[in-house]
Regions:
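Core structural elements
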Residues: 4-26
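Cys/His-rich metal-chelating microdomains
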Residues: 184-187, 203
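C-terminal edge-of-domain segments
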Residues: 141-177
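Residue-level signal for inorganic ion chemistry
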Residues: 14, 59, 109, 181
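Acidic, turn-prone loop/beta-hairpin segments
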Residues: 19-108, 115-130, 155-157, 162-168, ...
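Glycine-rich phosphate/diphosphate-binding loops that line cofactor/substrate pockets in enzymes
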Residues: 113-118, 175-178
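Extended, charged helical/alpha-beta scaffold domains that provide interaction surfaces
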Residues: 123-151
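Short cysteine-rich clusters marking metal-coordination/redox-active sites
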Residues: 178-181, 197-200
Length: 214
């Protein structure tokens, strides 16, 4: 049971969601900027917990991982259970809803991909029509929503009718692709022979772009 829960967490929440999302921060944000450091801090805490979780199940792997990850000479089996210094306030229901929304967006993108209309999800622009309650729930993410859904642009609206499920419309972006982050953006600038977006230009110098730390 414990092994299955850990495997599901690594496959679903990490592999299919979080790690996919933070690639943009890891590869395109300033290397010492707060946006990239935020995701690195999250990964640090995740590894602290994950190595402890797997230690009773795959002990040698856990010990090897601990030696690579930590400068601590002691064994992982000498460590206490890892707890964050301060508990994080997070609305888990909203995040579960966001994962479900991302799954639905991906299904729609996959249909276009099978038709040959689209390649990468970053080729897509998404418009989502919500009920009023769902609009308030998701609009709080602002510009961060396009990074969470791995698309180039997201626009939201409120339906004048009752909706049980969000209505998702996807179109292929007509904007040019930034040569650095691969997002499609209306206005690109020439920078040392490369056509890149204003976000990437800001990320070339410290501290880089301002992002919600999620």
């Amino acid at each position: 049971m414990a092994f299955q829960k850990i495997l599901n967490f690594c496959t679903n929440e990490l592999g299919s969601f979080y790690l996919d999302i933070i690639k943009d921060r890891a590869y395109t944000c300033h290397h010492d900027g707060p946006a990239r450091k935020s995701s690195q801090t999250a990964m640090f805490h995740l590894l602290q917990m994950l190595i402890r979780w797997i230690s009773p199940i795959i002990s040698f792997t856990a010990e090897e991982a601990w030696k690579e990850f930590s400068n601590d000479e002691s064994s992982i089996f000498e460590k206490e259970w890892y707890l964050l210094v301060e508990p994080l306030e997070s609305d888990l229901d909203v995040w579960n809803d966001l994962i479900n929304l991302k799954d639905e967006v991906n299904k729609n993108i996959e249909i276009l991909r099978e038709e040959g209309s689209i390649g990468s999800s970053l080729d897509a622009e998404v418009h989502i029509t919500f009920s009023e309650n769902d609009f308030l729930k998701f609009s709080r993410f602002g510009e961060e929503l396009k990074f969470l859904l791995l698309v180039s642009n997201v626009s939201l609206s409120v339906s004048d009718k009752d909706l049980d499920e969000p209505k998702i419309d996807i179109k292929v972006s007509i904007d040019e692709k930034c040569e650095r982050c691969w997002h499609h953006v209306a206005d690109l600038s020439d920078h040392e022979g490369n056509k890149i977006c204003s976000r990437c230009i800001s990320n070339l110098s410290f501290p880089g772009e301002a992002r919600q730390m999620i």
